[in-house]
Amino acid sequence: NTRRQRQMCIRDRSEIAVRQGQTQLILTDKGLSFERLPMPMLLCVGAINTYLIEKKLRGYVSINVQSGEALDTHSFATLIGVGATTVNPYLAFDSLHQRHEKKLFGQYSFDDCVARYIKSVNAGLLKIMSKMGISVLSSYRGGCNFETVGLSRTIVNDYFPGVVSKISGIGLTGIEKKIRQIHKEAFESTDTVLPIGGIYRYRKNGETHQYQGRLIHLLQSSVSSNSYSVYKKYAEGIYDLHPINLR
């Protein structure tokens, strides 16, 4: 089956469940295997939320998400923003448990670690919502108060109607290709240590950062020493970078 057919199957099953009187839907990406590939949770939630709204059934059911994709406040905000009622970040909890078993959290119990994680996520969500003048999660849920970058307008119209999409991008076929590639690398690799990735901090083989450590060091050195020649090295390094930002 194509990814679009699977998305339609999920929508149809959700409608049937609601019409049969179910009040809780649970979407989970657990149970992956070599033969079982995940679907992006954001697309699943958006598809079901939009479809149930069209059928005038959304108010009768809660959409509960159990996903390994939910790790930081951005992922929580987007999942809730497209319609998720609750989010269970099981992979984040598993990661906390692993680190707690290694005694990396000092005197804190595992329950304390989970509580502190939840508190930080809630604080991050409140900060995101407050920038829009929203203080209640129910007012933020399903509002799609963001815009997409790199998704085709067909996907945006089908799964996230009303979301601003100034720049188009890949469609379902492209997304599926990426998922298959990542899934293949994960299940065929013999490595037991995950690559760091460099999302939050610059890594040599990780994600590209405009403000790399070397350049930041040059900027700080130029300020502390009041050296224009060092600043020129910093400026040259910035100009030599390949285009990174869209603007």
Task: Please state what every model-predicted region is.
Residues 27-43:
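Glycine-rich, proline-tolerant flexible connector loops at the mouths of alpha/beta enzymes
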